[in-house]
Amino acid sequence: MLKIADTTFTSRLFTGTGKFATAELMLEALRASGSQLITMAMKRVDLQAGNDAILAPLRQLGVRLLPNTSGAKTAQEAVFAARLAREALGTHWVKLEIHPDVKYLLPDPIETLKAAEILVKEGFVVLPYCGADPVLCKRLEEAGCAAVMPLGAPIGSNLGLRTRDFLQIIIAQAKVPVVVDAGIGAPSHALEAIELGADAVLVNTAIAVARSPVKMAHAFRLAVESGELACQAGLGNRQFDRAIATSPLTGFLSQLEEENHV
């Protein structure tokens, strides 16, 4: 079980809605993922149309929608998008994204913190996408964010946990859930994040662009569940300086030597 703000989730796999070939394929994949929190970009939603191709099908799934402010380049733009989402969708949850750099889509730490402080004061449940910066994540936590979402690698890169060392620090010191977001390109990456101690992962591109998005979504679901089960079972300590035999020697060999000398 994972609790963020006032909501409990049984799945630690969060998913996105971008890059799918069709809305029907998106829905099939999201169902296969078992995800209960699905993020969507406000810039892609037609709020004037009651039968929006993205929004209408998502509402049928019965999951929590997490509108994001992707496309915002400043705190002011992000706050405006969050307010618009609350009014249009009736949710006070928001994934805060501010990335002015259109090439690498790296989050702006200064604008993100500024927007987070404003939105928290306005009653939003804020989940900020941010760099894997332990100091920034702590500041966002102190500002009242319900979780932090540090990147594993640049958005859509599928490179995995390139920020692993910093993620470990963030996880170790966080008092709110840590959701690894961006760069997760394979189920093994998601498994690694959960085993590392992350509370959840958010995956979009790796599922949407797969040859079979439905099968890939199911694979990610199994990977995350496997990682959670492994953590519950208790992972063994790692040894770097020596090996430890799985079957320690007893007096067995000594007894054989004595018998050979008789």
UniProtKB/Swiss-Prot annotation:
Which gene carries the instructions for this protein?
Answer: thiG
Primary site of residence: cytoplasm
HAMAP family given for it? ThiG
**Which InterPro entries does this one have?**
Aldolase_TIM (IPR013785), Thiazole_synthase_ThiG (IPR033983), ThiG (IPR008867)
What is any Pfam family matched here? ThiG
**Subcellular location per the Swiss-Prot or TrEMBL entry:** Cytoplasm
Q: What is this protein called?
A: Thiazole synthase
Q: Could you tell me the EC number(s) of this protein?
A: 2.8.1.10
Active site location: K95 (schiff-base intermediate with dxp)
Q: Explain the purpose of this protein.
A: Catalyzes the rearrangement of 1-deoxy-D-xylulose 5-phosphate (DXP) to produce the thiazole phosphate moiety of thiamine. Sulfur is provided by the thiocarboxylate moiety of the carrier protein ThiS. In vitro, sulfur can be provided by H(2)S.
| Record bears the keyword Cytoplasm | yes
Q: How is this protein annotated for GO cellular component?
A: cytoplasm
- Naturally occurring in which organism (per UniProt): Yersinia enterocolitica serotype O:8 / biotype 1B (strain NCTC 13174 / 8081)
Q: Which SUPFAM superfamilies match?
A: ThiG-like
Q: Name one GO biological process term.
A: thiamine diphosphate biosynthetic process
Which residues make up the binding site for 1-deoxy-D-xylulose 5-phosphate? Answer: G156, A182, G183, N204, T205
Which lineage is the organism of this entry classified under, starting from the top rank? Answer: Bacteria, Pseudomonadati, Pseudomonadota, Gammaproteobacteria, Enterobacterales
**What GO molecular functions are on record for this protein?**
thiazole synthase activity
Family membership noted in the UniProt record: Belongs to the ThiG family.
Q: Which reaction does it catalyse?
A: [ThiS sulfur-carrier protein]-C-terminal-Gly-aminoethanethioate + 2-iminoacetate + 1-deoxy-D-xylulose 5-phosphate = [ThiS sulfur-carrier protein]-C-terminal Gly-Gly + 2-[(2R,5Z)-2-carboxy-4-methylthiazol-5(2H)-ylidene]ethyl phosphate + 2 H2O + H(+)
Q: Which UniProt key words apply to this protein?
A: Cytoplasm, Schiff base, Thiamine biosynthesis, Transferase
**Quaternary organization:** Homotetramer. Forms heterodimers with either ThiH or ThiS.
Q: What does the record give as its pathway?
A: Cofactor biosynthesis; thiamine diphosphate biosynthesis
User: Which EC class, in a word?
Assistant: transferase
